[in-house]
């Protein structure tokens, strides 16, 4: 509706029965009419992938490698493509951030992630997501700054694969600001020229920052809010 889709993220511990997990996904699809489900944790991937009631629902997961996909009759060496399955490719984020910051021995990973496009399911490439740094913070911070979360900066990932371009956090130094803008352009170039489906976090298109907070789920304030007036600057 209105040219947007709504997906819900569901986390499974692996202790639920496969039937319960399947029923939960079906419930969200048929009762709330979500367009897709991002499966986190330990979901029964093969059961959900082969569920005929979910055949028209986008299912995103960290990996579909363990899912058996039938061969095509026309091309026996290829697996039948399941258009509703998408891999949430965190490997792209890690490898391309390391490329962006100039880590050694990354050419092979650059080629792999740029060309990767499995025949059986789609790949969703991204440089930032809801659980981590925004793209602006990716080029502004080398350390997380989650003090405002009230957990003594212990929450959130310590592995962010980022480079601050010479200064940690906000700065007015012209050369640093220019370098960060250049790095953002490089990041978008890597994203859009790679095979698969590009995805970017809302606000990254205008340089939104969470002040280095990479776990802002609990911040219902300026840290997590988007200032759409930045589109005009």
What does each model-found stretch correspond to?
Residues 1-33, 42-53, 57-58:
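Substrate-binding/active-site clefts of carbohydrate-active enzymes
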Residues 7-19, 33-43, 96-99, 166-179, ...:
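The substrate-binding groove and active-site-proximal loops of carbohydrate-active enzymes
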Residues 17, 21-28, 180-191, 195, ...:
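Alpha-helical packing segments of well-folded alpha/beta enzyme cores
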Residues 33, 45-200, 217:
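Conserved alpha/beta catalytic core and glycan-binding cleft of carbohydrate-active enzymes
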Residues 41, 62, 204:
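Glycine-rich beta-strand-to-loop/alpha-helix junction loops that act as flexible
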Residues 201-206, 210:
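Short acidic/histidine-rich active-site segments
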Residues 210-233:
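Extended hydrophobic/aromatic segments used for targeting, binding, or gating
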């Amino acid at each position: 509706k209105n040219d947007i889709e709504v997906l819900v993220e569901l986390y499974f511990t692996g202790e639920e029965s496969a039937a319960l997990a399947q029923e939960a996904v079906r419930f969200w699809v048929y009762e709330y009419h979500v367009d897709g489900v991002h499966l986190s944790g330990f979901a029964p991937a093969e059961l959900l992938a082969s569920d005929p009631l979910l055949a028209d629902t986008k299912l995103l997961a960290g990996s579909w490698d363990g899912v058996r996909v039938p061969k095509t009759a026309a091309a026996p060496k290829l697996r039948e493509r399941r258009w509703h399955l998408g891999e949430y490719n965190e490997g792209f984020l890690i490898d391309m951030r390391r490329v962006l910051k100039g880590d050694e021995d990354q050419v092979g990973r650059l080629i792999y992630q740029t060309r990767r496009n499995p025949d059986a399911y789609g790949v969703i490439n991204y440089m930032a997501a809801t659980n981590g740094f925004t793209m602006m913070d990716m080029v502004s911070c080398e350390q997380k700054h989650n003090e405002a979360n009230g957990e003594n900066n212990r929450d959130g990932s310590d592995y962010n694969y980022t480079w601050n371009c010479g200064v940690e956090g906000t700065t007015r130094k012209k050369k640093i600001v220019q370098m960060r803008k250049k790095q953002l352009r490089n990041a978008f170039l890597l994203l859009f020229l790679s095979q698969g489906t590009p995805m970017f976090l809302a606000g990254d298109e205008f340089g939104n920052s969470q002040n280095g907070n990479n776990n802002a789920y609990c911040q219902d304030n300026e840290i997590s809010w988007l200032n759409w007036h930045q589109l005009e600057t």
